[in-house]
């Protein structure tokens, strides 16, 4: 195999790895928003606090996806 073919294979594998790596944050976001809606439906008076905590959790989960994206670009 020449160097160009190896570079293409490595690029394809990193994209596949990133695709698999985004499954966790995607599932995490779905659970996060679902539970936030459920909590707001149960206690509407706490919606402000629930929303604040939800946005903090959103940032933490999104960081995982961004780290996976950067790792895929580096490799």
From Swiss-Prot:
Belongs to the ATPase C chain family. F-type ATPases have 2 components, F(1) - the catalytic core - and F(0) - the membrane proton channel. F(1) has five subunits: alpha(3), beta(3), gamma(1), delta(1), epsilon(1). F(0) has three main subunits: a(1), b(2) and c(10-14). The alpha and beta chains form an alternating ring which encloses part of the gamma chain. F(1) is attached to F(0) by a central stalk formed by the gamma and epsilon chains, while a peripheral stalk is formed by the delta and b chains. One of its GO terms (cellular component) is proton-transporting two-sector ATPase complex, proton-transporting domain. This is ATP synthase subunit c. It comes from Bifidobacterium longum (strain NCC 2705). InterPro entries: ATP_synth_csu_bac/chlpt (IPR005953), ATP_synth_F0_csu (IPR000454), ATP_synth_F0_csu_DDCD_BS (IPR020537), ATP_synth_F0_csu_sf (IPR038662), ATPase_proteolipid_c-like_dom (IPR002379), F/V-ATP_Csub_sf (IPR035921). It is found in: Cell membrane. F(1)F(0) ATP synthase produces ATP from ADP in the presence of a proton or sodium gradient. F-type ATPases consist of two structural domains, F(1) containing the extramembraneous catalytic core and F(0) containing the membrane proton channel, linked together by a central stalk and a peripheral stalk. During catalysis, ATP synthesis in the catalytic domain of F(1) is coupled via a rotary mechanism of the central stalk subunits to proton translocation. Key component of the F(0) channel; it plays a direct role in translocation across the membrane. A homomeric c-ring of between 10-14 subunits forms the central stalk rotor element with the F(1) delta and epsilon subunits. SUPFAM superfamilies: F1F0 ATP synthase subunit C (SSF81333).
């Amino acid at each position: 195999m020449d160097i160009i073919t190896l570079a293409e294979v490595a690029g394809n594998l990193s994209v596949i790895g990133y695709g698999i790596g985004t499954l966790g944050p995607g599932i995490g976001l779905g659970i996060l928003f679902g539970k936030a809606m459920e909590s707001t439906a149960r206690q509407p008076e706490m919606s402000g606090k629930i929303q604040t905590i939800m946005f903090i959790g959103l940032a933490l989960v999104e960081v995982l996806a961004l780290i996976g994206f950067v790792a895929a670009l580096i490799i």
